[in-house]
């Protein structure tokens, strides 16, 4: 239904809508690193597709306002799937969705943050889903708290990703993966901040 639903809703509600909500999670159940890391290209295509739909409805209605995007939920999520299937139904405060992230996950989160910055002209809000314990960059236990690998790209983007995003043109070798073509080996974004 992707595309049809967004277009239909905007066609009916364009004058009442300021933001279109997006959600997306990525996993690596197939243990396919090249394809997993290429998911940032899938996120880029997803954003571009929704922007095109918003702009098509705007053109059809001769609208003046530009609908922006709110990427309400995004993250890497797959490590805990098998463990969560074994949980007792209706248990009290079960430990669930507690993914323990690796370096591949940090690379993809970093690339997804780059993708969000590159689309800052239209993606005005983006929320990493969740922040503590549940598919999260920070984990806690009775004995303390620790930062996972995905914490660091998020932290550095928060520090250095403030300002005006510049149009960056990068020429680098590309590869094809199981689901994506022409994936660049180099992903980058520049942010100017006085």
Model-derived features: where do they sit?
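Active-site-proximal structural segments of metal-dependent nucleotidyl cyclase/transferase enzymes
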Residues: 50
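Alpha-helical scaffolding within the catalytic cores
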Residues: 2-12, 111, 182-186
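Short helix-capping segments at alpha-helix termini
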Residues: 57-64, 121
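Aromatic/hydrophobic pocket-lining residues that form the small-molecule binding cavity
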Residues: 43-47, 109
């Amino acid at each position: 239904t992707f595309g049809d639903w967004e277009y239909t809703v905007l066609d009916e509600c364009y004058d009442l809508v300021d933001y279109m909500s997006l959600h997306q999670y990525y996993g690596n159940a197939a243990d396919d690193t090249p394809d997993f890391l290429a998911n940032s290209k899938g996120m880029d295509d997803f954003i571009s597709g929704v922007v095109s739909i918003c702009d098509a409805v705007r053109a059809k209605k001769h609208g003046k306002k530009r609908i922006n995007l709110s990427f309400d939920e995004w993250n890497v999520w797959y490590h805990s799937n098998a463990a969560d299937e074994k949980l007792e139904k209706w248990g009290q405060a079960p430990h669930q969705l507690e993914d323990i992230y690796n370096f591949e996950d940090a690379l993809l989160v970093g690339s997804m943050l780059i993708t969000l910055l590159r689309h800052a002209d239209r993606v005005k809000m983006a929320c990493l889903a969740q922040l503590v314990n549940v598919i999260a960059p920070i984990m806690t236990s009775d004995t303390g708290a620790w930062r996972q690998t995905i914490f660091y790209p998020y932290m550095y983007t928060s520090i250095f990703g403030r300002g005006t995003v510049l149009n960056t043109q990068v020429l680098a070798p590309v590869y094809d993966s199981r689901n994506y073509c022409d994936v660049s080996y180099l992903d980058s974004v520049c942010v100017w901040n006085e």
